[in-house]
Amino acid sequence: MASLGQILFWSIISIIIILAGAIALIIGFGISGRHSITVTTVASAGNIGEDGILSCTFEPDIKLSDIVIQWLKEGVLGLVHEFKEGKDELSEQDEMFRGRTAVFADQVIVGNASLRLKNVQLTDAGTYKCYIITSKGKGNANLEYKTGAFSMPEVNVDYNASSETLRCEAPRWFPQPTVVWASQVDQGANFSEVSNTSFELNSENVTMKVVSVLYNVTINNTYSCMIENDIAKATGDIKVTESEIKRRSHLQLLNSKASLCVSSFFAISWALLPLSPYLMLK
């Protein structure tokens, strides 16, 4: 027959087992309630020396205090950026990103975790991860960030040339782009034998100025100077008539993966100028 002490001992053990089981169930229900949330990134490119955006969105959560945003970069030990409890937490930020990052704090509650990166450097290129925790769950997504230099070209009539000539200039490109001329009238024509392109290294010894000259230009025609590398494609158009010159330019950021959204901008500016009286175009 069991003694009173043994009965008490086994009773306590039973209670402990029951409590442990209850705690395990509570934890289990808590974990099961936190599901994976959708996090979406958009591949993008940064222009050296300017500010860039690494785009990331997630399922909105009205509980700002529960939202944690972490940006990480492959090959970097420290964090790129962290936002938690409604403010930046930069104690573990890697040195290479100090003073250069920020999230859009007023837009976090609506699901915007995009990162602003100041003064983009070549070394900022790489694979980034946007990691999100909310009261609804957690999730992450990677993005490829390319860095280089790109700028809008401008095409002008070269009044100093001895023949009918167009001059296309763009101040900053990297890596070295290709330059191709095209004509609306002579579609498909190869202008490589009547054009000359040069690249001049800028003062920071990274980016280069692009200058391309097209000879034997004819009147009442639209010419396009197309500059392209693996990051961006820019086009400068010029239309020369008997009475005026019209210009247009646009630039689009390219993406190595067509399935992802293209980060781009399109700017058009027309300039209407009187044709020089001494410019004689055939």
UniProtKB/Swiss-Prot annotation:
BP-aspect Gene Ontology terms: adaptive immune response; negative regulation of apoptotic process; negative regulation of T cell activation; negative regulation of T cell proliferation; positive regulation of interleukin-2 production; positive regulation of T cell proliferation; regulation of cytokine production; response to protozoan
Signal sequence bounds: 1-24
Residue spans, topological domain Extracellular: 25-259
One Pfam family linked to the record: V-set
The entry's keywords: Adaptive immunity, Cell membrane, Disulfide bond, Glycoprotein, Immunity, Immunoglobulin domain, Lipoprotein, Membrane, Repeat, Signal, Transmembrane, Transmembrane helix
Protein location: Cell membrane
Induction remarks: Up-regulated by IL6/interleukin-6 and IL10/interleukin-10 and inhibited by CSF2/GM-CSF and IL4/interleukin-4 on antigen-presenting cells (APCs).
Segments in the Cytoplasmic topological domain: 281-282
InterPro entries tied to this protein: BTN3A2-like_Ig-C, Ig-like_dom, Ig-like_dom_sf, Ig-like_fold, Ig_sub, Ig_V-set, IgSF_BTN/MOG
Disulfide bonds: C56-C130, C168-C225
Residues covered by the Ig-like V-type domain: 35-146, 153-241
Tissue expression notes: Overexpressed in breast, ovarian, endometrial, renal cell (RCC) and non-small-cell lung cancers (NSCLC). Expressed on activated T- and B-cells, monocytes and dendritic cells, but not expressed in most normal tissues (at protein level). Widely expressed, including in kidney, liver, lung, ovary, placenta, spleen and testis.
Highest taxon in the source lineage: Eukaryota
Regions crossing the membrane: 260-280
Role noted for this protein: Negatively regulates T-cell-mediated immune response by inhibiting T-cell activation, proliferation, cytokine production and development of cytotoxicity. When expressed on the cell surface of tumor macrophages, plays an important role, together with regulatory T-cells (Treg), in the suppression of tumor-associated antigen-specific T-cell immunity. Involved in promoting epithelial cell transformation.
Entries under PANTHER family matching the protein: BUTYROPHILIN, V-SET DOMAIN-CONTAINING T-CELL ACTIVATION INHIBITOR 1
Protein name: V-set domain-containing T-cell activation inhibitor 1
Gene source species: Homo sapiens (Human)
Gene: VTCN1
